[in-house]
């Protein structure tokens, strides 16, 4: 029992040391922005969690339409889960086909179960990570998701939707994400609407690229960019 406690203490100590290596960002003061809505909205994460790498990039489809597309790195990350899980399931099933057919036990299907979990996780990330994120001046709206405004009877059915005139500003904020063995900053780009509601656009770990994309989007929309990452 003592060795387990020592191991737990070591892991906790290691995590604290890793966290100490991450620079602590200054707290942003919204009063530095002379705008009443900036004082009213939240400056905490709109979408908890994130990624340590760049998951999306802004692409100009034409002069009146911009889209955030998943990066090659993000697609490969999702595919690793799908491919690894598929290989594990096929390899184990092929190697143990005889025992699987003659006797059914939890130990026999456990590796296959874990393989399917990897496939499902990869499929889940692919489905949501590659969903369209569109700013369209033709339709005068923004939407994020598999369903666009033309596919629903009422746009109120869409969770992540806004008409472009309702967009008041863009917001960049940071979030310190901690896992068991690692910690990193992820950065959100959010829309701020005229009613104070926020909609998350993208959330990833490359602040330099996010700022460039946000500035391009700010110019495209003609809306101010509020950058809270100090």
Task: List the model feature ranges, each with a label.
Residues 33-52, 116-127:
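Short, solvent-exposed secondary-structure boundary motifs
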Residues 3-6, 26-39, 49-54, 58, ...:
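Non-transmembrane, membrane-adjacent beta-strand/coil modules in membrane-associated proteins
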